[in-house]
């Protein structure tokens, strides 16, 4: 293993942490409708639980309404029930074979709770990134111990790892700020 391998590996892992954080943020409901909100809803499809996207077409009807069109008419009631029981605070309404899912307006108190959740998720993502930094630095120290690189190379590489860490932590902070702004906009 070389210094380049360590740096490349840690950067890829940090980028994956950022992607996972973005996915977590997408699940947090804001006042606006987006189809990603229903991504983790599971529907009972002939005895097995499948994601809603595998049994229905999700569309945005308008800024505050998601349209869910099940591919099979007999699935309408099951899809509606799954959305209702997903504990998202949503109340779907069926019109024929189209399920409309209106986004209720968030109360001020709920907005504040959601910003706390966003900050907490952000901290978790930052901790994950810092743990990756620690692992990379340990790998570099092992290379020095095994006499594969010099201490100067290790110092330069750990500085580079720190720069990567700072860059990714700043990206998490930016994502947290934009999500908070999105939540607090009425």
Swiss-Prot record:
Subcellular location, principal: cytoplasm
Keyword Cytoplasm tagged: yes
Localization per Swiss-Prot or TrEMBL: Cytoplasm
Alphabetical list of InterPro entries matching this protein: Ribosome_recyc_fac, Ribosome_recyc_fac_dom, RRF_sf
Disulfide-linked positions: none
GO biological process: cytoplasmic translational termination
GO MF term (any one): ribosomal large subunit binding
Gene Ontology cellular-component annotations: cytosol
One Pfam match: RRF
Annotated SUPFAM superfamilies: Ribosome recycling factor, RRF
Keywords per UniProt: Cytoplasm, Protein biosynthesis
Segments crossing the lipid bilayer: none
Function: Responsible for the release of ribosomes from messenger RNA at the termination of protein biosynthesis. May increase the efficiency of translation by recycling ribosomes from one round of translation to another.
UniProt family annotation: Belongs to the RRF family.
Protein name: Ribosome-recycling factor
Organism this protein belongs to: Burkholderia ambifaria (strain MC40-6)
Lineage: Bacteria, Pseudomonadati, Pseudomonadota, Betaproteobacteria, Burkholderiales
